[in-house]
């Protein structure tokens, strides 16, 4: 019966990812962004549950899943659009922007490591967690290169983004951060794509700065994590 569902075709993996994503997006908007209905989070949980309940192997899903994964990298390039729109702001405050993002990213990496050793995680788990500050498209190859588990890295990236999506804007308001540049950088640095989505709700400048942060954080993770990993692990 299951064989007739086309599980050996790319369409299967794509639909298993796309259907819950579309449904979750609808309800996420209807509930004004209730964090447990974040589309990425729901898609991940629904996909795992479906494969587990049906007994279909991950390899069958991966045929279509790899196609989605392929488009992650070119999709990341789209962050250059809002960056271009706010290029004058970038030119004017480039030192503060790059400095703030760099400090925030390094602190995030060190905090991840401290939490990991506090709970006595193994080196493979630590290696999987270190790249989570970047988007999935960047974090996965970095994780693979330092001996991490890509699936665990993907989970860490998504959970991190969901938390920032849910609480990021509230934290910004709690600390009374009124500068749109600072707000956008904070959300983009800590929550990557979903952080940018949260920044977009605050304003165009916040969205642009969040997009800039995502790009720069990715560059820092690619450059720094492979150097830090042999030292920390």
Curated annotation (Swiss-Prot):
Q: Which residues cross the membrane?
A: 5-25, 33-53, 63-83, 97-117, 152-172, 212-232
Specify one Pfam family.
LrgB
What are the UniProt keywords, alphabetically? Cell membrane, Cytolysis, Membrane, Transmembrane, Transmembrane helix
Q: A cellular component term (GO) from this record?
A: plasma membrane
The protein's superkingdom reads Bacteria
Topology versus the membrane? Multi-pass membrane protein
- Report the record's Gene Ontology biological process terms: cytolysis; killing of cells of another organism; programmed cell death
Family membership noted in the UniProt record? Belongs to the CidB/LrgB family. LrgB subfamily.
Q: What does this protein do?
A: Inhibits the expression or activity of extracellular murein hydrolases by interacting, possibly with LrgA, with the holin-like proteins CidA and/or CidB. The LrgAB and CidAB proteins may affect the proton motive force of the membrane. May be involved in programmed cell death (PCD), possibly triggering PCD in response to antibiotics and environmental stresses.
What protein am I looking at?
A: Antiholin-like protein LrgB
| Species annotation | Staphylococcus epidermidis (strain ATCC 12228 / FDA PCI 1200)
């Amino acid at each position: 019966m299951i064989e007739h569902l086309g599980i050996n075709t790319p369409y299967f993996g794509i639909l298993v990812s796309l259907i819950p994503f579309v449904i979750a997006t609808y309800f996420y908007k209807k509930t004004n962004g209730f964090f447990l209905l974040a589309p990425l989070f729901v898609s991940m949980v629904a996909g795992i549950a479906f494969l587990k309940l049906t007994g279909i192997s991950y390899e069958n899903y991966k045929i279509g899943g790899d196609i989605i994964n392929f488009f992650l990298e070119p999709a990341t390039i789209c962050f250059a659009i809002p960056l271009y729109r706010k290029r004058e702001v970038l030119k004017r405050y480039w030192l503060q922007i790059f400095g703030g993002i760099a400090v925030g990213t390094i602190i995030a990496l060190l905090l991840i490591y401290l939490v990991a050793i506090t709970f006595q995680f193994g080196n493979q788990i630590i290696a999987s967690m270190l790249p989570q500050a970047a988007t999935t498209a960047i974090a996965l190859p970095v994780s693979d290169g330092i001996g991490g588990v890509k699936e665990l890295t993907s989970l860490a990236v998504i959970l991190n983004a969901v938390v920032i999506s849910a609480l990021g804007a509230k934290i910004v308001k709690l600390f009374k951060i009124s500068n749109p540049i600072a707000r956008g950088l904070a959300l983009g640095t800590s929550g990557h794509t979903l952080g940018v989505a949260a920044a977009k709700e605050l304003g165009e400048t916040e969205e642009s700065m969040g997009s800039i942060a995502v790009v720069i954080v990715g560059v820092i993770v690619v450059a720094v994590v492979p150097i830090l990993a042999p030292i920390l692990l």
